[in-house]
C-alpha cells in the first residue's frame, strides 16, 4: 500500500499547500468497489466509486501497481490485452477505452444512462453494455468504437449472460415492471435473440422477486442461476421469524425451454442470509456473496441439483428454508459488505464494499486470508450511514437491512407493503428515500412527522432492532446526501421539445398547486382520487426522479406515469387530449 501513498504524494506536488493539508487530514477515502476482475497477468483490477479510479493491484491485493482517474464513476470493467474497457456513469453513460500503455482514455463511447456490466460476446467481436436507467442493452463495435445495435428490456438491466451456443442473451431486470396492486408482483429475466438483437421473451420469477443482481450459467449450459431478494409483500410486516418479510434466493431458469423452474432459498429457518449479491458456479460448487450478513455461501452443486430436480412441487420451493440443509457452508468474511467477487481456479477473491478488506477464500479448505487494501481508510457520517443502511447485522436474525425494501441506493422495490403504522390490511407502495428528510411528513399517509422519526421507527418495527442515536444520525446523514440521477428523458441535460410542451400542460392543469417548489411538493395532505383511506387524504410526494419510482399512486395501481393521467385521471378534472397526456408524461418523467 506504500505505492498508493507514493502516487498520492506525487500527484499533490503541484497542489497548493492548503490543499495538501486538507487531504492529509481527511485520510484515505473509501474505495466503494463497483467491479473486480483479474487480467491475463493475474493482476487484480478494481473500479472504485469512492475515488473514481481504476486501480491495478498485485494478485494478493497488497501492492498498488497503477491507478487511473476517470471523469465519472466507473461502474464496470473489461480487460483486453493492453486496453481496459470501463463503463462510467454519473450524467452520461459511456464505455471508455483506456490504454494501459499510455495511461490515457483513447475513446469515450456514449452508450446510455446507467452504463454498467460490460462484457464480450461469445466471439469477442463485440462488447455488450447494460444501460440500467435507459432500460436497454447495446452492442458496441470496439474497432469502430460506436454503438451498432440496441434493444430495450423491461426495467433497470444490471447483468447478463449468454447461452452456451451464443444464440441468446439472458438479462436481469432489477425491479418488477408492472402495477403493484395485484396478487403476483415479480421481476423478470429478458431473453434477447442475438441474430436479430430483439427481445423475444420475459421470464417472470417467483412472486416477490426483486433486486435481481447476479447471474451465472452452469458449465453444461442447462441452467441459469439468478441471485435476488424475495419480498413477502402479501402479509403484514408484523414479524421477522422464518423470513416473514424478506428472504434471499437464487432462481433457476431452464435455458433450452427459456422458463423459470424454481427458486432456492439461501436463508435458514432461524438465520437470514440478507443482501444476496453475486453468484458463480462450476461443476462442483455454487458460490454466493451475502452483502448484508458478510459471508459467502459455498453450495454442493451436484447434490443441490439432484435434490432440486427431484423436488416434486417446485412451486412451493421458494418457501422451503431447509432445502440447503447439509448442502451448504456459510463462510464468514472479514470486513463489511461483500458484493462482486472473482472466481479463479481454486479461490474466490472477494472485496468488501464498506471496508476495503480483500478476502481470499480457498474453495477446498474454506480458509480465508484477509488483506487491508486501504490502511488509513476514514468514513464520513454519510459513509457510515450507508453502511448501516445495508447491514443486516442490525436486524433480528439477519433477515434484512433497509436495503431489503429500498434497493438501488435507497430507492424503491416496486412493491406494496402492509406496514403496521397505519392499520392492517391496507398495503401502500414502497417509496424512494430521495429527499425524504426535506419533504415531511413521511409515508404516503403522513403518519410519521419526519424522516428522522421514520428512520428510528423503521429500525425498531421493521428490523426489530433498537439503534443507538449516533447510528440513526448517520443514517439520516446518508439519506440527506442522496442526489437524483439525471433523468434519461433529458436531452443533453435539457428538457426535450415534447417535455417543454408538457410543462405548459402541467401549468394549464394547475398541477403546480400541489406539486410546487424546488421538490415539486407542497408537503401537505390532499384528498384526491378514489379510495381515500384517511380523512386528511394523502401526502403529496416529490416529483423529482419520479421516472425511476414506478408504479404510481398510493397502492401502485398505475404501472406507468402515462396511466396516472390517462387511466386514473390524477388531478385532472377536464378533458385532456392524448397528445397533451403524452407531453405531460414526458415532462414529469424529465424531472
Language-model features: locations:
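Predominantly soluble domains enriched in secretory-pathway, periplasmic, or organellar proteins
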Residues: 16-387
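Short amphipathic alpha-helical segments
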Residues: 9, 52-54, 562
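Periplasmic c-type cytochrome electron-transfer domains
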Residues: 197, 201, 212-219, 226-239, ...
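Intrinsic disorder/low-complexity segments
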Residues: 7-8, 19-22, 447-448
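Bacterial N-terminal signal peptides that target proteins for export
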Residues: 2-14
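Secretory pathway export signals and precursors
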Residues: 11, 15-16, 107, 126, ...
Amino acid at each position: 500500500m506504500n505505492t498508493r501513498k507514493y502516487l498520492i504524494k506525487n500527484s499533490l506536488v503541484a497542489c497548493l499547500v492548503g490543499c495538501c493539508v486538507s487531504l492529509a487530514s481527511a485520510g484515505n477515502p473509501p474505495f466503494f468497489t463497483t467491479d473486480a476482475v483479474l487480467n491475463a497477468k493475474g493482476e487484480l483490477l478494481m473500479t472504485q466509486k469512492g475515488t473514481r479510479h481504476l486501480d491495478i493491484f498485485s494478485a494478493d491485493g497488497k501492492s498498488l501497481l497503477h491507478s487511473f482517474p476517470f471523469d465519472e464513476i466507473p461502474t464496470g470493467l473489461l480487460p483486453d490485452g493492453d486496453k481496459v474497457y470501463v463503463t462510467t456513469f454519473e450524467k452520461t453513460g459511456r464505455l471508455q477505452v483506456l490504454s494501459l500503455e499510455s495511461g490515457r482514455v483513447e475513446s469515450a463511447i456514449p452508450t446510455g444512462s446507467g452504463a454498467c456490466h460490460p462484457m464480450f460476446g461469445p466471439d469477442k467481436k463485440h462488447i455488450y453494455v447494460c444501460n440500467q436507467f435507459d432500460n436497454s442493452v447495446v452492442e458496441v463495435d470496439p474497432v469502430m468504437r460506436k454503438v451498432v445495435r440496441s434493444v430495450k428490456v423491461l426495467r433497470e438491466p444490471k447483468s447478463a449472460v449468454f447461452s452456451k451456443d451464443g444464440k441468446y442473451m439472458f438479462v436481469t431486470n432489477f425491479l418488477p415492471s408492472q402495477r403493484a396492486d395485484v396478487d403476483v408482483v415479480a421481476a423478470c429475466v429478458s431473453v434477447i435473440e442475438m441474430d436479430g438483437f430483439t427481445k423475444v421473451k420475459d421470464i417472470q420469477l417467483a412472486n416477490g422477486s426483486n433486486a435481481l443482481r447476479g447471474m451465472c450459467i452452469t458449465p453444461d449450459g442447462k441452467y441459469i442461476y439468478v441471485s435476488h431478494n424475495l419480498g413477502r409483500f402479501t402479509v403484514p410486516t408484523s414479524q421477522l421469524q422464518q423470513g416473514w418479510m424478506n428472504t434471499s434466493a437464487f432462481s433457476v431458469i431452464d435455458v433450452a425451454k427459456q422458463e423459470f423452474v424454481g427458486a432456492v432459498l439461501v436463508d435458514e429457518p432461524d438465520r437470514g442470509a440478507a443482501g444476496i449479491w453475486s453468484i458463480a458456479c462450476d461443476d462442483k460448487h455454487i458460490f454466493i456473496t451475502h452483502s448484508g450478513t458478510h459471508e459467502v455461501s459455498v453450495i454442493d452443486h451436484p447434490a443441490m441439483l439432484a435434490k432440486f430436480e427431484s423436488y416434486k412441487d417446485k412451486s412451493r420451493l421458494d418457501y422451503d428454508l431447509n432445502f440447503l440443509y447439509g448442502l451448504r457452508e456459510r463462510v464468514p468474511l472479514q470486513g463489511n459488505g461483500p458484493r462482486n467477487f472473482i472466481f479463479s481456479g481454486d479461490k474466490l477473491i472477494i472485496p468488501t464494499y464498506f471496508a476495503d478488506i480483500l478476502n481470499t477464500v480457498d474453495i477446498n479448505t474454506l480458509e480465508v486470508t484477509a488483506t487491508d487494501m486501504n490502511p488509513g481508510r476514514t468514513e464520513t457520517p454519510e459513509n457510515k450511514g450507508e453502511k448501516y443502511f445495508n447491514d443486516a447485522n442490525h436486524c433480528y436474525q439477519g433477515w434484512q437491512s433497509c436495503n431489503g425494501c429500498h434497493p438501488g441506493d435507497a430507492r424503491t422495490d416496486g412493491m406494496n407493503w402492509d406496514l403496521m403504522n397505519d392499520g392492517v390490511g391496507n398495503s401502500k407502495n414502497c417509496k424512494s428515500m430521495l429527499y425524504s428528510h426535506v419533504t415531511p411528513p413521511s409515508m404516503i399517509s403522513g403518519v410519521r412527522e419526519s424522516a428522522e422519526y421514520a428512520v428510528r421507527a423503521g429500525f425498531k418495527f421493521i428490523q426489530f432492532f433498537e439503534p443507538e442515536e449516533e447510528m440513526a444520525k448517520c443514517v439520516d446523514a446518508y439519506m440527506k446526501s442522496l442526489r437524483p440521477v439525471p433523468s434519461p428523458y433529458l436531452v443533453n441535460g435539457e428538457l426535450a421539445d415534447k417535455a417543454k410542451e408538457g410543462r405548459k400542460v402541467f401549468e394549464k392543469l394547475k398541477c403546480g398547486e400541489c406539486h410546487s417548489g424546488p421538490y415539486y411538493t407542497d408537503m401537505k395532505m390532499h384528498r384526491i382520487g378514489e379510495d381515500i383511506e384517511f380523512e386528511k387524504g394523502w401526502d403529496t410526494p416529490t416529483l423529482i426522479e419520479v421516472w425511476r419510482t414506478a408504479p404510481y399512486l398510493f397502492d401502485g395501481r398505475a404501472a406507468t406515469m402515462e396511466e396516472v393521467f390517462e387511466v386514473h385521471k390524477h388531478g385532472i378534472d377536464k378533458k385532456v387530449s392524448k397528445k397533451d397526456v403524452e407531453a405531460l408524461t414526458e415532462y414529469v418523467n424529465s424531472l
